[in-house]
Protein backbone atom coordinates (compact mmCIF):
# COMPACT_ATOMS: atom_id res chain seq x y z
CA UNK A 1 0.00 0.00 0.00
CA UNK A 2 1.32 3.43 -0.90
CA UNK A 3 1.34 6.59 1.23
CA UNK A 4 -1.13 8.14 -1.24
CA UNK A 5 -3.51 5.20 -0.88
CA UNK A 6 -3.27 5.50 2.90
CA UNK A 7 -4.11 9.23 2.71
CA UNK A 8 -7.10 8.45 0.48
CA UNK A 9 -8.37 5.83 2.92
CA UNK A 10 -7.97 8.21 5.83
CA UNK A 11 -9.71 11.07 3.97
CA UNK A 12 -12.55 8.69 3.05
CA UNK A 13 -13.33 8.27 6.74
CA UNK A 14 -11.69 4.93 7.42
CA UNK A 15 -10.70 5.24 11.08
CA UNK A 16 -9.02 1.90 11.86
CA UNK A 17 -6.40 0.07 9.87
CA UNK A 18 -5.05 -3.41 10.51
CA UNK A 19 -1.74 -4.35 8.91
CA UNK A 20 -0.53 -7.93 8.40
CA UNK A 21 2.99 -7.39 9.71
CA UNK A 22 3.24 -11.00 11.04
CA UNK A 23 6.90 -10.65 12.09
CA UNK A 24 9.69 -8.12 12.10
CA UNK A 25 12.25 -10.79 11.25
CA UNK A 26 13.17 -10.88 7.58
CA UNK A 27 14.11 -14.56 7.91
CA UNK A 28 10.65 -15.39 9.28
CA UNK A 29 8.87 -13.30 6.67
CA UNK A 30 10.74 -15.18 3.96
CA UNK A 31 9.84 -18.56 5.53
CA UNK A 32 6.20 -17.47 5.60
CA UNK A 33 6.29 -16.50 1.93
CA UNK A 34 5.46 -12.88 2.75
CA UNK A 35 6.31 -10.36 0.06
CA UNK A 36 7.28 -7.53 2.41
CA UNK A 37 10.40 -7.00 4.51
CA UNK A 38 10.48 -5.98 8.15
CA UNK A 39 11.62 -2.49 7.14
CA UNK A 40 8.75 -2.15 4.66
CA UNK A 41 6.29 -3.13 7.39
CA UNK A 42 7.75 -0.51 9.74
CA UNK A 43 7.66 2.14 6.99
CA UNK A 44 4.02 1.29 6.22
CA UNK A 45 3.03 1.72 9.88
CA UNK A 46 4.69 5.15 9.97
CA UNK A 47 3.12 6.10 6.63
CA UNK A 48 -0.32 5.14 7.96
CA UNK A 49 0.23 7.27 11.06
CA UNK A 50 1.37 10.19 8.88
CA UNK A 51 -1.76 9.72 6.73
CA UNK A 52 -3.88 10.37 9.81
CA UNK A 53 -4.62 6.92 11.21
CA UNK A 54 -4.64 7.04 15.02
CA UNK A 55 -6.13 3.57 15.47
CA UNK A 56 -3.55 1.23 13.99
CA UNK A 57 -3.46 -2.51 14.54
CA UNK A 58 -0.76 -4.99 13.58
CA UNK A 59 -1.16 -8.74 13.18
CA UNK A 60 1.61 -10.84 14.69
CA UNK A 61 2.19 -14.57 14.19
CA UNK A 62 3.65 -16.77 16.93
CA UNK A 63 5.13 -20.28 17.00
CA UNK A 64 6.65 -19.82 13.58
CA UNK A 65 9.12 -22.27 12.04
CA UNK A 66 12.38 -22.23 14.00
CA UNK A 67 11.16 -19.25 16.06
CA UNK A 68 13.10 -18.62 19.26
CA UNK A 69 12.22 -16.65 22.36
CA UNK A 70 14.96 -14.13 21.51
CA UNK A 71 13.64 -13.61 18.00
CA UNK A 72 10.10 -13.07 19.29
CA UNK A 73 11.37 -10.69 21.98
CA UNK A 74 13.10 -8.60 19.31
CA UNK A 75 10.00 -8.51 17.11
CA UNK A 76 7.64 -7.52 19.93
CA UNK A 77 10.12 -4.93 21.24
CA UNK A 78 10.29 -3.29 17.81
CA UNK A 79 6.55 -3.59 17.25
CA UNK A 80 5.52 -1.81 20.46
CA UNK A 81 7.79 1.12 19.64
CA UNK A 82 5.71 1.84 16.53
CA UNK A 83 2.73 4.25 16.59
CA UNK A 84 0.19 1.44 16.99
CA UNK A 85 -2.71 0.99 19.40
CA UNK A 86 -3.62 -2.68 18.90
CA UNK A 87 -1.98 -6.06 18.29
CA UNK A 88 -3.60 -9.32 17.22
CA UNK A 89 -1.27 -12.23 18.00
CA UNK A 90 -2.07 -15.63 16.53
CA UNK A 91 -0.35 -19.01 16.75
CA UNK A 92 0.54 -20.53 13.39
CA UNK A 93 -1.47 -23.68 12.72
CA UNK A 94 -0.45 -25.70 9.68
CA UNK A 95 -3.55 -27.30 8.12
CA UNK A 96 -3.44 -30.47 6.02
CA UNK A 97 -3.46 -29.87 2.28
CA UNK A 98 -2.03 -26.35 2.51
CA UNK A 99 1.27 -25.36 0.90
CA UNK A 100 2.88 -25.28 4.37
CA UNK A 101 1.75 -28.86 5.00
CA UNK A 102 3.11 -30.01 1.64
CA UNK A 103 6.43 -28.28 2.42
CA UNK A 104 6.55 -29.97 5.86
CA UNK A 105 6.70 -26.59 7.60
CA UNK A 106 5.03 -28.02 10.73
CA UNK A 107 8.13 -30.14 11.33
CA UNK A 108 10.12 -26.94 11.88
CA UNK A 109 7.54 -25.31 14.17
CA UNK A 110 7.92 -25.26 17.95
CA UNK A 111 6.21 -28.05 19.89
CA UNK A 112 3.04 -27.25 21.84
CA UNK A 113 4.85 -26.47 25.10
CA UNK A 114 7.29 -24.11 23.39
CA UNK A 115 4.43 -22.49 21.45
CA UNK A 116 2.62 -21.90 24.76
CA UNK A 117 5.78 -20.37 26.23
CA UNK A 118 6.13 -18.06 23.21
CA UNK A 119 2.49 -17.01 23.55
CA UNK A 120 2.91 -16.25 27.26
CA UNK A 121 6.09 -14.32 26.49
CA UNK A 122 4.20 -12.17 23.97
CA UNK A 123 1.35 -11.62 26.45
CA UNK A 124 3.83 -10.43 29.07
CA UNK A 125 5.80 -8.19 26.71
CA UNK A 126 2.68 -6.60 25.29
CA UNK A 127 1.27 -6.04 28.78
CA UNK A 128 4.44 -4.35 30.00
CA UNK A 129 4.24 -2.07 26.94
CA UNK A 130 0.68 -1.01 27.83
CA UNK A 131 -1.26 -3.32 25.53
CA UNK A 132 -4.01 -4.85 27.68
CA UNK A 133 -5.28 -8.28 26.72
CA UNK A 134 -9.06 -8.21 26.13
CA UNK A 135 -9.44 -11.42 24.11
CA UNK A 136 -7.32 -14.52 23.80
CA UNK A 137 -5.43 -13.10 20.78
CA UNK A 138 -6.09 -9.35 21.03
CA UNK A 139 -4.26 -6.64 22.92
CA UNK A 140 -4.98 -2.91 22.91
CA UNK A 141 -4.02 0.33 24.52
CA UNK A 142 -6.85 1.67 26.67
CA UNK A 143 -9.82 2.71 24.54
CA UNK A 144 -8.58 1.03 21.36
CA UNK A 145 -10.19 -2.38 21.71
CA UNK A 146 -11.87 -3.58 18.50
CA UNK A 147 -15.43 -2.27 18.74
CA UNK A 148 -16.66 -4.98 16.37
CA UNK A 149 -15.18 -7.74 18.49
CA UNK A 150 -16.57 -6.26 21.70
CA UNK A 151 -20.03 -5.87 20.16
CA UNK A 152 -19.88 -9.44 18.89
CA UNK A 153 -18.99 -10.87 22.31
CA UNK A 154 -21.68 -8.79 24.03
CA UNK A 155 -24.33 -9.83 21.43
CA UNK A 156 -24.80 -6.22 20.35
CA UNK A 157 -25.79 -5.32 16.76
CA UNK A 158 -23.18 -4.35 14.19
CA UNK A 159 -23.23 -3.64 10.47
CA UNK A 160 -20.82 -5.34 8.09
CA UNK A 161 -19.96 -3.43 4.91
CA UNK A 162 -17.68 -4.57 2.10
CA UNK A 163 -16.58 -7.78 0.39
CA UNK A 164 -17.25 -10.87 2.54
CA UNK A 165 -18.74 -8.73 5.32
CA UNK A 166 -21.76 -9.90 7.27
CA UNK A 167 -24.08 -8.49 9.90
Where are these predicted regions, by residue range?
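C-terminal scaffold of the Radical SAM
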Residues: 1-167
Amino acid sequence: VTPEQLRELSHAGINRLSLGVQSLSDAQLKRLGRLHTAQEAVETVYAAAEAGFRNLSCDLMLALPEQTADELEQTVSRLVQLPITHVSAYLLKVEQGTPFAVQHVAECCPDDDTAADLYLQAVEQLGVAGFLQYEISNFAKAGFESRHNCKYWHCEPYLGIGPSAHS
